């Protein structure tokens, strides 16, 4: 598969992995999920098996199956399907990277290993290069998330000269609040050869001002439409409207963070908003409480984020 003609830009939903109540992957709802993202949220790019997708809580076999289902269900509907293939060992990452190429994914991403950690830039690039080489036809993205990995190598340091060592390198998923580091990445990218995708949803407008080319996030599963309105306002240089959208989104995110917000709660919110059952998380995570879901629902309604009649009634959207 050749590199896509279009660079990855705009909103990218970090997809949830739907599960049954007994913890098995609920493959049959993924087609419905694709239709919901495209038709209801206006989101046509996805990031599969990342943090939101509990990728590192799945077996290699499960990760392969999940990737296949998203690619198959997204064909002729989604613009780009990027598969996260990061793992704690290079062999698993290489296997998943090769598989992503075989099934027709549009790109791969890799997070830094976080048990035995790379101690410097060269060591990390050596790991990333070996994984990228397993899928030489696919665009390669580095998934920068130091809060989860504990790897403190700055993204701007990593970007310096990276394409000389990883020819397929096409960009960065930057999930950190360090806007100085992100700004230096943008400054290096003056020819706009890389996709610089911001990963902190509640700070997206700040990143857009600095030059982000897109965003990857969990809230775009259910707040994609509102966030797209913010992007449109920003592109039209209507900063007042863009700020209004960002502040409304922040009110919700700030509220649920105070309640305790993570993958489990994201699954509960997505089930509530979309009507598609996301199920519980995989252990060691625990299911969101009914109290959390009720409070999140009330906040969504107060912000007019629950507007679809089918959503308010809790009815799943028909699968196309």
Swiss-Prot record:
Biological pathway: Amino-sugar metabolism; N-acetylneuraminate degradation
Enzyme class of the recorded protein, top EC level: lyase
Secretion signal, residue range per the UniProt entry: none
EC number from the UniProt entry: 4.1.3.3
Residues forming the catalytic site: 143, 173
InterPro entries, per the entry: Aldolase_TIM, DapA-like
GO molecular function, one term: identical protein binding
Gene Ontology CC annotations of this record: cytoplasm
Keyword Lyase: yes
Keywords: Carbohydrate metabolism, Cytoplasm, Lyase, Phosphoprotein, Schiff base
Localization per record: Cytoplasm
Transmembrane residue ranges: none
Modified residues (Phosphoserine): 308
Catalytic function, reaction form: aceneuramate = aldehydo-N-acetyl-D-mannosamine + pyruvate
GO biological process, alphabetically ordered: N-acetylneuraminate catabolic process
Pfam families named among the record's database cross-references: DHDPS (PF00701)
Annotated family: Belongs to the DapA family. NanA subfamily.
Function: Catalyzes the cleavage of N-acetylneuraminic acid (sialic acid) to form pyruvate and N-acetylmannosamine via a Schiff base intermediate. It prevents sialic acids from being recycled and returning to the cell surface. Involved in the N-glycolylneuraminic acid (Neu5Gc) degradation pathway.
Subunit structure: Homotetramer.
Protein name as annotated: N-acetylneuraminate lyase
Lineage: Eukaryota, Metazoa, Chordata, Craniata, Vertebrata
């Amino acid at each position: 598969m050749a590199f896509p003609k279009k660079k990855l830009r705009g909103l990218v939903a970090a997809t949830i992995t739907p599960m049954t109540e007994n913890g098995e992957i609920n493959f049959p709802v993924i087609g419905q999920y694709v239709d919901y993202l495209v038709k209801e949220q206006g989101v046509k790019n996805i990031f599969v098996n990342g943090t939101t997708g509990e990728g590192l809580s799945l077996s290699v076999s499960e990760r392969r199956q999940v990737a296949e289902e998203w690619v198959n269900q997204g064909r002729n509907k989604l613009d780009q399907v990027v598969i996260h293939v990061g793992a704690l060992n290079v062999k698993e990452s290489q296997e998943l990277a090769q598989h992503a190429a075989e099934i027709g994914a549009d790109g791969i991403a890799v997070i830094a290993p976080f048990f035995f950690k790379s101690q410097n830039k060269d060591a990390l690039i050596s790991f990333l290069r070996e994984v990228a080489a397993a899928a030489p036809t696919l665009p390669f993205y580095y998934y920068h998330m130091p809060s989860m990995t504990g790897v403190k190598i700055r993204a701007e340091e990593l970007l310096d000269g990276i394409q000389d060592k990883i020819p397929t390198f096409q960009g960065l998923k930057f999930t950190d609040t360090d806007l100085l580091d992100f700004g230096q990445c943008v400054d290096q990218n003056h020819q706009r050869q890389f996709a610089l995708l911001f990963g902190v949803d509640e700070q997206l407008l700040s990143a857009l001002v600095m030059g982000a080319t897109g965003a990857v996030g969990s809230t775009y599963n259910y707040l994609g439409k509102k966030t797209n309105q913010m992007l449109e306002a920003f592109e039209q240089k209507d900063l007042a409207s863009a700020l209004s959208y960002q502040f409304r989104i922040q009110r919700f995110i700030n509220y649920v963070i105070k309640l305790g917000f993570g993958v489990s709660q994201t699954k509960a919110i997505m089930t509530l908003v979309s009507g598609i059952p996301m199920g519980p998380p995989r252990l060691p995570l625990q299911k969101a409480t009914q109290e959390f879901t009720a409070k999140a629902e009330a906040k969504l309604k107060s912000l007019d984020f629950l507007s679809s009649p089918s959503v308010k009634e809790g009815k799943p959207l028909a699968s196309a």
